[in-house]
Amino acid sequence: YISVTGVQTCALPIFSEKRGDTVHIDVIDRHGNMVSVTPSGGWLQSSPTVPGLGFCLNSRAQMFWLAPDLPTSLAPGKRPRTTLTPSLALHEGRPTLSFGTPGGDQQDQWQLSFFLRHVHHGLDLQAAIDRPLFHTAHFPGSFHPRTREPGSLMLEETFGVATIDELRRRGHRLTVTEPWSIGRLTAAKRDPDGLLRAGATPRLMQAYAIGR
C-alpha cells in the first residue's frame, strides 16, 4: 500500500522530468577508427506536420529565419546555422581526438574551453572536462523565440571570487551557478602508440567513459 499523500516529487527538475533530448557519443575502436556523433532533432515532438505535404521539419530546420535577405533565411538548397558540433581533431594528419557535448547554443562554447585546456594547457582529458565552465547568451538564440541577453555570462562559482569580481568590474552581467552544473562534455583519444583514453563529465551523473 502506498499513500498518495506521502509521495514526493523529485526536487531536481532535470531528474524528475523524463523526456527525449540531445545526446553525444565518442567512439574509437582498436584499429583507430573514430566517430563523434550528436544525435538530436526531436522533430516528432517539436515540429508539426507541414500542411499539405505530410512531413515534419527536423528541429534544426527551425533555425532558419523567415525574414528575407539574411544568411540563414529560409530558401531552397540552403542549410541553417546549426548548434550540433560533433568534433574530431587531427594531429599530423592522423585522427587523434573525438569530443563533443549536448547543449544547444552552448556546445561550441563548452567544447572550445575543453579543447584549449587540453591542447594548449596540457590538461588530460578528464582534467580538461572537470575544470569550471562558462557560456554566454549574448548572441541571439538559435531556437524560437531567439531571445538574447546582451552582456550576460553564466559561470560556475568554482572560478573563484577574484575572477567573478573582476568579470563584474568589467561590466559582465553574471549568473553564478553551483559547482558541477554547466557542461555535458565527453572525449576519447588515441595516443600515437595506440593507447586509448577517455573522459566524461561527472556533472548531473549522465555521462560515462567505458573501455574494453
Regions found by a protein language model. Name each.
Residues 1-10:
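Single conserved hydrophobic/aromatic residue that forms the stacking wall/gate
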Residues 5, 93, 183:
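Structured loop/turn residues at beta-strand edges in well-structured enzyme cores
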Residues 15-179:
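Proteins synthesized as precursors that undergo proteolytic processing into mature forms
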Residues 161-212:
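In a subset of proteins, long, contiguous C-terminal domains/tails are tracked
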